[in-house]
UniProtKB/Swiss-Prot annotation:
Keywords: Plastid, Ribonucleoprotein, Ribosomal protein, RNA-binding, rRNA-binding. The keyword Ribonucleoprotein applies. One of its GO terms (cellular component) is mitochondrial small ribosomal subunit. Pfam families: Ribosomal_S19. GO terms for biological process: ribosomal small subunit assembly; translation. Belongs to the universal ribosomal protein uS19 family. This is Small ribosomal subunit protein uS19c. One of its GO terms (molecular function) is rRNA binding. NCBIfam families: rpsS_bact. It comes from Cuscuta reflexa (Southern Asian dodder). Its main location: plastid. PROSITE patterns: RIBOSOMAL_S19.
Length: 92
């Protein structure tokens, strides 16, 4: 179910503070966050945000076509290794 248009998009407060500080400094720095549910807003464009995958932080460069999506959409938590191979010797 989509979020109501009456409400503002969810962005974690600590993440928003870090982005505002970097916009004032005009420095490029990787921002580390655990907030996968935060929505990407236009002031995040151009920053590199390291999103937690459950094991490590994956750095993602935010571009303008990502605005409106959630941070967690770009950092996968599962690693698909392929289906099990068919082993006819073990079957009877």
């Amino acid at each position: 179910m989509a979020r109501s248009l009456k409400k503002n998009p969810f962005v974690a407060k600590n993440l928003l503070k870090k982005i505002y500080k970097l916009n004032i400094k005009t420095e490029k720095e990787i921002i580390i966050t655990w907030s996968r549910g935060s929505t990407i807003i236009p002031i995040m464009v151009g920053h590199t945000i390291a999103i937690h995958t459950g094991k490590e932080h994956l750095p993602i460069y935010i571009m303008d076509h990502m605005v409106g999506h959630k941070l967690g959409e770009f950092a996968f938590t599962l690693n698909f290794r392929g289906h099990a191979k068919t082993d006819n010797r073990s079957r009877r």
